[in-house]
């Protein structure tokens, strides 16, 4: 409830016959209210003050400079007071926003800052969503739109709301102009990686994280975090030629040995069998969404490890009984399926999808692998990875020069 003092002061200003005097009187009262009202009372007094400024008795032309002074003052207040007052302000401005779009945008930005300070990220994002960007009254450049939408995306991602985040990321993709600002481009790629990661598009996410880890102007510790995220996503991706290429790119990066994920990366790249202990240690570094169960009751990690170990087994054996393969893969019988039948199902799906070369004799329960790569060929693959790394490095240098970036 507003104080009696501000009620009386505003009544006196509203009854003043001279519009020229009102601007100064409103500004003087605002300064006096902020300096004299105690914190718990201040929000109520400012809300009552706003009601007077935005009443029908005062034209919007006269109200605009008063609003500008009010916004300047609002920036200096506590986040709690800002939320109460700014939320009331944007509600009042909805009916008159066409005439005060710039002031409405500034108040919404203050409101978003306050919500973010209180870790209310969804509320902050929604406050920013209300900013008018396609209007004849207020011209907004594509660069400013990108900056606004990137912030909204990041706020939604703070609460793992990937659906809302992706909707605004798609708006950026649909802009006719490219993102020129390096920092905005970096935030875009990182946001895209996080969304793809959450949607379990792990190969795409790995590539985006890796690109961020190579970007100029990023702190070294953040680069390594992005590289570690790229490795985790590559490990979780379905086994196959595309993942093998991604693993090779990550493995030949000189920085890979600096992150904890290097051990599992090396074993996967060299097609070595993973032990349950190694998988358990790796699982502790995964995010909750990366450990969520799928429809069949397994996790993405469980499936990725089984498929990897199946590929690793194909490098060790020319053929193997399905029951023996089930034991190697650590599969357990459940329901009507034996461990061998589960192993056969995994192998059949991978062969059908072209991610494993081989054939299955269902009558004898034997899987025949077709592979020209044996365990002794690992050094050749390491050599190939080195050559590939050199080629990609040269290409990256050429790209950086073409884009005008410093070569790091």
UniProtKB/Swiss-Prot annotation:
Any Pfam family hit: PSMD12-CSN4_N
Subcellular location(s) per record: Cytoplasm; Nucleus
SMART domains hit by this protein: PINT
CC annotations in GO: COP9 signalosome; cytoplasm
Keywords noted in UniProt: Cytoplasm, Nucleus, Signalosome
Main location: cytoplasm
Residue ranges of the TM segments: none
SUPFAM superfamilies: Winged helix' DNA-binding domain (SSF46785)
PCI domain segment(s): 194-374
This protein's record includes keyword Thylakoid: no
The protein's assembly and partners: Component of the COP9 signalosome (CSN) complex.
Entry's family note: Belongs to the CSN4 family.
Listed PANTHER family: 26S PROTEASOME NON-ATPASE REGULATORY SUBUNIT 12/COP9 SIGNALOSOME COMPLEX SUBUNIT 4, COP9 SIGNALOSOME COMPLEX SUBUNIT 4
Free-text function comment from the UniProt entry: Component of the COP9 signalosome (CSN) complex that acts as an regulator of the ubiquitin (Ubl) conjugation pathway by mediating the deneddylation of the cullin subunit of SCF-type E3 ubiquitin-protein ligase complexes. The CSN complex seems to link protein degradation to sexual development. Required for fruit body formation.
This protein's name: COP9 signalosome complex subunit 4
Organism field: Emericella nidulans (strain FGSC A4 / ATCC 38163 / CBS 112.46 / NRRL 194 / M139) (Aspergillus nidulans)
Lineage: Eukaryota, Fungi, Dikarya, Ascomycota, Pezizomycotina
């Amino acid at each position: 409830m507003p104080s009696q003092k501000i009620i009386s002061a505003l009544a006196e200003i509203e009854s003043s016959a001279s519009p020229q005097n009102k601007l100064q009187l409103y500004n003087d009262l605002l300064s006096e209210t902020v300096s004299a009202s105690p914190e718990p009372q201040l929000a109520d007094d400012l809300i009552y003050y706003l009601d007077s400024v935005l009443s029908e008795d005062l034209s919007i032309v006269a109200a605009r400079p008063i609003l500008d002074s009010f916004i300047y003052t609002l920036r200096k207040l506590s986040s709690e007071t800002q939320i109460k007052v700014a939320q009331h302000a944007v509600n009042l401005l909805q009916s008159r926003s066409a005439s005060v779009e710039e002031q409405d945008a500034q108040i919404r930005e203050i409101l978003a800052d306050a919500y973010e300070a209180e870790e209310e990220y969804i509320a902050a994002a929604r406050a920013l969503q209300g900013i008018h960007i396609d209007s004849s009254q207020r011209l907004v450049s594509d660069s400013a739109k990108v900056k606004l939408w990137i912030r909204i995306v990041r706020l939604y991602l703070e609460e793992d709301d990937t659906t809302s985040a992706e909707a605004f990321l798609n708006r950026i993709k649909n802009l006719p102009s490219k993102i020129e600002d390096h920092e905005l481009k970096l935030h875009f790629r990182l946001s895209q990686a996080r969304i793809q990661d959450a949607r379990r598009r792990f190969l795409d996410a790995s590539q985006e994280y890796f690109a961020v880890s190579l970007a100029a102007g990023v702190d070294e510790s953040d680069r390594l975090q992005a590289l570690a995220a790229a490795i985790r996503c590559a490990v979780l991706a379905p086994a196959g030629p595309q993942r093998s290429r991604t693993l090779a790119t990550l493995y030949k990066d000189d920085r890979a040995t600096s992150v904890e994920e290097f051990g599992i990366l090396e074993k996967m790249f060299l097609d070595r069998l993973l032990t349950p202990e190694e998988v358990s240690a790796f699982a502790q570094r995964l995010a909750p969404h990366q450990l969520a169960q799928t429809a069949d009751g397994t996790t993405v990690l469980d499936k990725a490890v089984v498929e990897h170990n199946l590929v690793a087994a194909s490098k060790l054996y020319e053929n193997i009984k399905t029951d023996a393969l089930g034991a190697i893969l650590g599969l357990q019988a459940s329901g009507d399926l034996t461990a061998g039948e589960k192993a056969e199902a995994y192998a059949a799906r991978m062969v059908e999808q072209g991610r494993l070369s081989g054939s299955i004799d269902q009558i004898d329960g034997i899987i025949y692998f077709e592979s020209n790569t044996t365990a002794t060929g690992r050094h050749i693959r390491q050599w190939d990875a080195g050559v590939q790394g050199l080629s990609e490095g040269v290409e990256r240098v050429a790209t950086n020069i073409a884009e005008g970036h410093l070569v790091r």
